[in-house]
């Protein structure tokens, strides 16, 4: 069984030679995490009419094969978050991806870090759900190699939902 306990994973992305984004494993119960989750929930509610909280709990991040991360700017301020949690032994689900858009490239930095971490944890596929109406998210995932799949799990039969998958190589 893979455990991230004791691992010090850290990725730094430098954009345009100026902006630094650091992504690392974090505490989903921290005040920084809570603040970003609330910002994400408000944004989702404004876009879709649903804050997305019903399909995610921070408690789920206690699983050995789950991971919660924060992205921080060069001043150390949390500007984005994301998570993976197990669906099966080989498939993880991408959850609560968010950037406050104060720094360009946060979404890409988070996604790259989570995909690389998922591979290290033994996952071979990542899945996710978003809403058709969330055009930015749909476009972002397509641009990053995710393909449309049949709705799975709690999203089966939900016409407002769209699901994506990516094989990790």
Q: Predicted regions: what is each one?
A:
Residues 21-95, 99-102, 111-112, 117, ...:
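Acetyl-CoA-dependent GNAT
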Residues 2-31, 169:
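Conserved N-terminal entry element of GNAT/NAT acetyltransferase domains
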Residues 109, 113, 135-136:
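Alpha-helical macromolecular-interaction surfaces
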Residues 21, 29, 69, 124-127, ...:
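C-terminal "cap" of GNAT-fold acetyltransferases
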Residues 8-15, 55-58, 151:
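Intrinsically disordered, low-complexity boundary segments flanking structured domains
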Residues 102-103, 136:
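Active-site-proximal flexible loops/turns
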């Amino acid at each position: 069984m893979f455990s991230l306990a004791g691992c010090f994973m850290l990725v730094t992305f430098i954009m345009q030679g100026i902006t630094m984004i650091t992504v690392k494993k974090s505490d989903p119960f921290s005040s920084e995490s809570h603040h970003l989750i609330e910002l994400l929930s408000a944004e989702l509610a404004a876009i879709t009419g649903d804050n997305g909280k019903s399909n995610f709990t921070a408690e789920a991040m206690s699983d050995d094969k789950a991971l919660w991360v924060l992205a921080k700017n060069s001043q150390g301020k949390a500007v984005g978050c994301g998570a993976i949690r197990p669906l099966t032994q080989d498939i993880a689900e991408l959850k609560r991806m968010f950037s406050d858009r104060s720094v360009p490239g946060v979404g890409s930095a988070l996604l790259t870090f989570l995909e690389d971490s998922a591979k290290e944890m033994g996952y071979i596929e990542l899945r996710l759900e978003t809403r058709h109406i969330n055009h930015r998210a749909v476009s972002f995932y397509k641009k990053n190699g995710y393909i449309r799949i049949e709705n799975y799990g709690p999203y089966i039969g939900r016409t407002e939902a769209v699901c994506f998958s990516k094989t990790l190589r």
